[in-house]
């Protein structure tokens, strides 16, 4: 094997190039690769964090929707209860008004019956007196006549 100076010079140049590369070229490349891997890791963690936040936001939205549905159903149920209560109150008022009208009608009818009886008693007493007058063909004393009428009214 013939080793000449060119080969030896090439080896020295190669070693200088290797040392120069390791000293000046390799560290920026390593730093660039490290920064790139750090950016990728940060991006992945940010994506995971965003995904977790999105899931949390979806859960909050679902909870708020469920709460809104429950509130809506509760309001509808309350409105139905109020409607039933108002209907019952109106029904009770109508029944009370009907009972009052019936009681008033009964009282009016009773009053008319009493009035008719009084009128009838007076007419019956007058007819009885007239009949007695015609039978006796004479007029009865006014005081006696009033006493007889009152007595007949009381009996009827």
Swiss-Prot record:
Q: Which Gene3D superfamilies match?
A: 6.10.250.1580
Tell me the GO molecular function terms: proton-transporting ATP synthase activity, rotational mechanism; proton-transporting ATPase activity, rotational mechanism
Kindly list the residue ranges recorded as spanning the membrane: 7-27
Principal location? membrane
Q: Does the keyword Ribosomal protein apply?
A: no
Q: GO cellular-component terms in the record? A: plasma membrane; proton-transporting ATP synthase complex
Cite the Pfam families for this sequence: ATP-synt_B
Q: Which UniProt keywords apply?
A: ATP synthesis, Cell inner membrane, Cell membrane, CF(0), Hydrogen ion transport, Ion transport, Membrane, Transmembrane, Transmembrane helix, Transport
Q: How does it sit in the membrane?
A: Single-pass membrane protein
Q: Identify the InterPro entries for this entry.
A: ATP_synth_B-like_membr_sf, ATP_synth_b/b'su_bac/chlpt, ATP_synth_F0_bsu_bac, ATP_synthase_B_chain
* Cited CDD domains: ATP-synt_Fo_b
Q: Which locations, inside or outside the cell, does it occupy?
A: Cell inner membrane
- Family to which the UniProt record says this protein belongs: Belongs to the ATPase B chain family.
Reported function: F(1)F(0) ATP synthase produces ATP from ADP in the presence of a proton or sodium gradient. F-type ATPases consist of two structural domains, F(1) containing the extramembraneous catalytic core and F(0) containing the membrane proton channel, linked together by a central stalk and a peripheral stalk. During catalysis, ATP synthesis in the catalytic domain of F(1) is coupled via a rotary mechanism of the central stalk subunits to proton translocation. Component of the F(0) channel, it forms part of the peripheral stalk, linking F(1) to F(0).
Subunit structure as annotated in this protein's UniProt entry: F-type ATPases have 2 components, F(1) - the catalytic core - and F(0) - the membrane proton channel. F(1) has five subunits: alpha(3), beta(3), gamma(1), delta(1), epsilon(1). F(0) has three main subunits: a(1), b(2) and c(10-14). The alpha and beta chains form an alternating ring which encloses part of the gamma chain. F(1) is attached to F(0) by a central stalk formed by the gamma and epsilon chains, while a peripheral stalk is formed by the delta and b chains.
Its recorded name reads ATP synthase subunit b
Protein species of origin: Paraburkholderia xenovorans (strain LB400)
By which gene is this protein encoded?
atpF
């Amino acid at each position: 094997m013939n080793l000449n100076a060119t080969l030896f010079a090439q080896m020295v140049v190669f070693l200088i190039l290797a040392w120069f590369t390791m000293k000046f070229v390799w560290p920026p490349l390593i730093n660039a690769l490290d920064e790139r891997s750090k950016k990728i890791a940060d991006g992945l963690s940010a994506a995971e964090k965003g995904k977790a936040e999105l899931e949390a936001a979806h859960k909050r939205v679902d909870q708020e929707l469920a709460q809104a549905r429950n509130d809506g159903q509760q309001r509808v149920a309350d409105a139905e209860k109020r409607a039933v209560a108002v209907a019952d109150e109106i029904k009770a008022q109508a029944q009370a008004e009907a009972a009052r009208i019936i009681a008033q009608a009964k009282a009016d009818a009773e009053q008319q019956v009493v009035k008719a009886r009084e009128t009838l008693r007076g007419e019956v007493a007058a007819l009885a007196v007239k009949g007695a007058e015609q039978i006796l063909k004479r007029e009865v004393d006014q005081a006696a006549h009033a006493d007889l009428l009152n007595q007949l009214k009381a009996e009827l």
